[in-house]
């Protein structure tokens, strides 16, 4: 048991500089400024550098089948839009810690190559969001519900699963939003700021609200698997779902979550049906309560 614990500590020491390098606030500073001030020129020029060349010499997004670089750019813009509404918690130690945990769990997935970014935002709502390209946000209200690192890993793994399975990207691809954007972006990506921002803003709405039940159930199953692979006690996510399920339906902190997600009781039932007693044989998983980062306020 002690060997497993010290191995996890060693791995975290390796990924600590990487987590610092992937600071979400610094990465999206210009995008957030653009979303709040309406200045998107710099963002569009960056987007252009990741796209293919159009007939007029301008760079174009391949919205229908984006490359990994384009997926990252889409997620970057959408996340910047979300952060324009709710800022990151001003606690560098918290953000660093969440990035360390998230990056370690994400490395257990088949999209370990993505430059994953994680952040905690100033909102007392209980919720979490993911965007294409490896961007994951959880609210301060949800973080308050957590009691140990395994539970944090469980929450993050659910959002990681959404990215790995391209749940939000598929909705964007199916929607008329991409048809709206493709006509413009296929010509000149910097031509019309209003239409571009409509696409990005609506994408943020989709990432925050709109997934069907099957996608949520799949993310729960995959999340438990990723958490277990990462060496954590596998019941972190179910414990969080159970705690949220005990929150009154009329409480404002869960109003959006209950409106846009299956009820936690239904999610727990589906998890039980899918997993059964197979986790009973998992030994040595850690909760790591002793190093769980406590909020300062």
Language-model regions, residue ranges each:
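Active-site scaffold of zinc-dependent metalloenzymes
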Residues: 124-149, 159-166
């Amino acid at each position: 048991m002690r060997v497993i614990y010290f191995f996890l500590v060693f791995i975290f020491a390796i990924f600590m500089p990487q987590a610092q390098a992937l600071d979400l606030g610094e990465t999206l500073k210009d995008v957030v400024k653009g979303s709040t001030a309406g200045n998107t020129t710099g963002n569009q020029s960056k987007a252009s550098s990741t796209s293919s060349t159009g007939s007029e010499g301008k760079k174009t997004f391949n919205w229908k089948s984006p490359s990994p670089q384009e997926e990252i750019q889409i997620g970057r813009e959408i996340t910047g839009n979300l952060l324009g509404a709710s800022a990151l918690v001003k606690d560098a130690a918290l953000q660093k810690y969440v990035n360390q945990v998230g990056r370690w769990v994400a490395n257990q997935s088949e999209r370990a190559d993505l430059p994953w970014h994680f952040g905690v935002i100033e909102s007392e709502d209980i919720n979490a969001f993911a965007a294409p390209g490896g961007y994951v946000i959880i609210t301060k209200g949800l973080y308050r519900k957590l009691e140990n690192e395994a539970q944090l890993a469980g929450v993050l793994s659910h959002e990681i699963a959404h990215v790995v399975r391209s749940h939000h990207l598929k909705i964007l691809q199916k929607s008329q939003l991409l048809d709206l954007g493709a006509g413009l972006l296929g010509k000149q990506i910097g031509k019309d700021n209003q239409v571009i921002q409509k696409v990005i803003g609506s994408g943020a709405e989709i990432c925050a609200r709109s997934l069907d039940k099957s996608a949520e159930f799949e993310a729960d199953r995959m999340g438990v698997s990723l958490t277990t692979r990462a060496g954590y006690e596998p019941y972190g996510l179910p414990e969080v779902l159970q705690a949220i399920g005990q929150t009154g339906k009329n409480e404002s902190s869960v109003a959006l979550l209950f409106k846009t997600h299956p009820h936690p009781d239904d999610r727990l039932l589906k998890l039980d049906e899918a997993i059964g007693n197979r986790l009973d044989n998992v030994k040595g998983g850690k909760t790591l309560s002793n190093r769980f980062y406590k909020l300062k306020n």
